[in-house]
């Protein structure tokens, strides 16, 4: 789900989608429920639709910028 204005202020980020349930390749790569996906392949995301569009343009992997609490890190997630 998209971040609320309050969450954006608390996390100090203007973009992001909250992971409500981690499954499949994302979960295997280490993404957890409660993480915030800030960008995919260096493209900021604010909605599931934006995330799907980036994934559709990707080949075999997506570089996911994750924010967990105050820490940001990249997670490579294989596609397919």
Where are these regions (language model features)?
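C-terminal recognition in membrane/secretory proteostasis and scaffolding
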Residues: 1-80
């Amino acid at each position: 789900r998209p971040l609320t204005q309050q969450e954006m202020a608390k996390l100090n980020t203007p973009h992001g989608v909250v992971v409500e349930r981690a499954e499949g390749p994302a979960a295997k790569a280490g993404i957890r429920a409660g993480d915030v996906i800030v960008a995919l392949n260096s493209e900021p995301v604010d909605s599931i639709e934006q995330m799907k569009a980036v994934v559709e343009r990707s080949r075999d992997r997506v570089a996911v910028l994750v924010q967990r609490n105050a820490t940001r890190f990249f997670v490579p997630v294989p596609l397919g």
